[in-house]
From Swiss-Prot:
PANTHER family: 23S RRNA METHYLTRANSFERASE, RADICAL SAM CORE DOMAIN-CONTAINING PROTEIN. Its cofactor is [4Fe-4S] cluster. The lineage of its organism: Bacteria, Pseudomonadati, Pseudomonadota, Gammaproteobacteria, Legionellales. This is Dual-specificity RNA methyltransferase RlmN. One of its GO terms (cellular component) is cytoplasm. S-adenosyl-L-methionine binds at G168, E169, S200, S222, L223, H224, N299. InterPro entries: Aldolase_TIM, Methyltransferase_A, RlmN_N, RNA_MTrfase_RlmN, rRNA_lsu_MTrfase_RlmN/Cfr, rSAM. CDD domains: Radical_SAM. Specifically methylates position 2 of adenine 2503 in 23S rRNA and position 2 of adenine 37 in tRNAs. m2A2503 modification seems to play a crucial role in the proofreading step occurring at the peptidyl transferase center and thus would serve to optimize ribosomal fidelity. Its EC number is 2.1.1.192. Disulfide bonds join C107-C342. NCBIfam families: rRNA_mod_RlmN. Belongs to the radical SAM superfamily. RlmN family. Pfam families: Radical_SAM (PF04055), RlmN_N (PF21016).
Amino acid sequence: MDQQKVNLLNYNYSQLRELLIAWDEKPFRAQQLFQWIHQVGIRDFAQMTNLGKVLRNKLSQLACIDLPEIVACQKSADGTHKWLLKLECGNCIETVFIPEANRGTLCVSSQVGCALNCSFCSTAKQGFNRNLSTAEIIGQVWLAARELSDNNGTHDKKITNVVMMGMGEPLLNFDNVVSAMNIMMDDLAYGLSKRRVTLSTSGVLPEMERLREVSPVALAVSLHAPTDELRNELVPINKKYPLSQLISLCKRYFKDEPRRKVTFEYVMLKGVNDQPEHASQLIKLLHNVPAKVNLIPFNPFPLTQYQRSSRETIDAFRDKLMKHGINTITRKTRGDDIDAACGQLAGEVKDKTSRSQRWQKLHFMSKTDKSTELTISSEEIA
């Protein structure tokens, strides 16, 4: 990218309006430009015919619409798409699209790698490099919309849902993720409703509180264990933010919208967290929580120590939760033949750091930059 030019994908509508005013342009031009970029899917300013030649020339001199580069695309036997996207820094991230009869869900990454080191997740094994910019996050949506369009041009409505469940912990890239989600929900851009944009977090409590105040999106929590002892092993951030604090926040997260529920994701690991006593502990943990539970069959990756629970074990676990009034769904595994399923996204991370260094890096970034700190079925985000 030309360092002298501004990447317009980093701007939401109000920011774009302010930018054009600063460039001595009429404010209404922002709506036209915003729609050209996100609704129509045009990058070439010369093709934005209603902007006027003078403005088009100015945009060519001052601005750009830079995107990650698609370096590989795989399509699963079940129709799932996975794109490997190369960033300007040379790192790669992955984005996944899951088609279903009445909707299409895009799984979007928020970081290059991940710092949280969940033991059952392939992304964690890649180390952590950096946060994605707003442009790199919304660029995944832009590219997927283009690739999925019938004529490989005008953006259509094949993407009906977006889940921030790709590589990284979204809440450790708070400002950029919220900015990108706001663009997703803008009627002048992608027009997704608040119930069709879901953020999945491992439980970064201060940022969960912030998110609750500033964004109406759906919330999913990567729970995966019913006790602190087990969750400390599977999801190490639990040592900092234990279950008692996490569940307390989840109980009141949608207090002003009593019909909305927090989704709890629970990967089923053979002999680890899938026994009847674990189900009983989970029932007790979620008592009086407005919750639904997604049971996720574990998706293996190279050198993992874990195995997937049997179908019979998963069904028995689900039935026990349902018997006690907890709405529970077993997630259908999609894209596992191309390593696009939940927990399998890895990308390609350069300059990988150790676990302790990752935390130090995030801690430093959070002090200096406010912006620091998979597959899914149709029933899960309705």
